[in-house]
Amino acid sequence: MATYVLGIADRHSDNIMVKKTGQLFHVDFGHILGHFKEKFGIRRERVPFVITNDFVHVINRGQTKKGQSKEFEKFQKSCETAFLVLRKYGNLMLSLFAMMISTGLPELSSEKDLSYLRDTLVSPTKSFYYFKKC
């Protein structure tokens, strides 16, 4: 959910690592706040977030169909809860990102760059719709 809210792009299996404990962690944060990669004028990320069949397989303990298991329902509920927590602290996140505008990050150089963050934090209904659709 954090990658969705922060608009972190270029998410693929080479940028998501797994620790021996089973915890996931992300690397390569070169594209944030909705500055998605394009190739030949085509936006590479076409949906707000992606849950691959491999991830569904792991979540469902071997099943590949989304929504077919209690594990997937628990995962979905956990994502919704995580979003609500992020949303609760949305003003703080916006303030912290606003303070970073002068740091020289190429994708955070003006107040306009904060609009993606504002938009993702606006509506839980819209976010839950995207999540359930994926």
Spans of features found by a protein language model:
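ATP-dependent kinase catalytic cores of phosphoinositide-metabolizing enzymes
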Residues: 13-14, 18-134
